[in-house]
């Protein structure tokens, strides 16, 4: 049996402000840093360890991983920073307040933009300063692969090559893997692992800073999965994530 741990980054500054973030590189709040440290403690107390870590190229996920590694005394393990694990690109919604956007366009439209499988938000213009073409962290990414908006289907399409070519082989070679990433890149992985339908994925939310442990068979099919931590607090966190895109 293999184990895989997925962790969404701790609360970010734009999570706190209820803004669409996507590829904008905002940092953790102090609450988010505390969540990440607590995640590391939970993993250590559960007797889990890691041989390799994966994260995105965005600091809120990177710093979350740092706190987890520090709490577990695993700062030395190799880390792969992969743009394919970035948050879904929210296009022209990046930086907008979710509740204000819902008040303008309606809760239903914002839910479609946030959670539907194949409907992207309005795209950025290529000349928009929020576009990532000139960002040095994507210097080796072909220009046509750098998005101006994404739906979850697009996020799955960029995450799965990394799973197939790197993450899955690492797991099957016996390495213990942790992935610190983002709500939608983790939703993409969970959709694949649990074979969630395109319709049902709309209802899946991922809480900040909470370790999600998968136990996998030899073919990397899930035997079970569970969150570490206080289950009532996790339920409250999931409810809070679900309500972010509603008009106040």
From Swiss-Prot:
Biased composition annotated in UniProt, kind: Basic and acidic residues: 127-137
Domain of life from the UniProt record: Bacteria
Listed EC numbers: 5.4.2.11
Keywords: Gluconeogenesis, Glycolysis, Isomerase
GO biological processes: gluconeogenesis; glycolytic process
Recorded catalytic activity of this chain's protein: (2R)-2-phosphoglycerate = (2R)-3-phosphoglycerate
Site (Transition state stabilizer): 182
SUPFAM superfamilies attached to this UniProt entry: Phosphoglycerate mutase-like
Tagged with keyword Isomerase: yes
InterPro entries given in the database record: His_Pase_superF_clade-1 (IPR013078), His_PPase_superfam (IPR029033), PG/BPGM_mutase_AS (IPR001345), Phosphogly_mut1 (IPR005952)
CDD domains cross-referenced by the UniProt entry: HP_PGM_like
Enzyme class: isomerase
Family the entry assigns: Belongs to the phosphoglycerate mutase family. BPG-dependent PGAM subfamily.
PANTHER family linked: PHOSPHOGLYCERATE MUTASE
Quaternary data: Homodimer.
Protein name per its UniProtKB record: 2,3-bisphosphoglycerate-dependent phosphoglycerate mutase
Phylogenetic placement of the source organism: Bacteria, Pseudomonadati, Pseudomonadota, Betaproteobacteria, Burkholderiales
């Amino acid at each position: 049996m293999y184990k895989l741990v997925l962790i969404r980054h701790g609360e970010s500054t734009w999570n706190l402000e209820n803004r669409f973030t996507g590829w904008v590189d905002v940092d953790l709040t102090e609450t988010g840093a505390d969540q990440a440290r607590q995640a590391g403690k939970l993993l250590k107390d559960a007797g889990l360890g890691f041989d390799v870590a994966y994260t995105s190229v965005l600091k809120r996920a990177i710093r979350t991983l740092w706190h987890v590694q520090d709490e577990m005394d695993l700062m030395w393990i190799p880390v792969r920073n992969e743009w394919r694990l970035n948050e879904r690109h929210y296009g022209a919604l990046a930086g907008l307040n979710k509740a204000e956007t819902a008040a303008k366009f309606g809760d239903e439209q914002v839910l479609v933009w946030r959670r539907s499988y194949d409907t992207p938000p309005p795209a950025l213009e290529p000349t928009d300063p929020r576009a990532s073409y000139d960002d040095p962290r994507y210097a080796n990414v072909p220009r046509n692969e750098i998005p101006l908006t994404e739906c979850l289907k697009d996020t799955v399409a960029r995450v799965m090559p990394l799973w197939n070519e790197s993450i899955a082989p690492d797991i099957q070679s016996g390495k213990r893997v942790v992935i610190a990433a983002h709500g939608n890149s983790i939703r993409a992985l969970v959709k694949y692992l649990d074979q969630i339908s395109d319709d049902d994925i709309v209802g899946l939310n991922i809480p900040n800073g909470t370790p999600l442990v998968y136990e996998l068979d030899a073919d990397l099919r899930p035997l079970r999965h569970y969150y570490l931590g206080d289950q009532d607090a996790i339920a409250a966190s999931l409810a809070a994530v679900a309500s972010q895109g509603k008009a106040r």
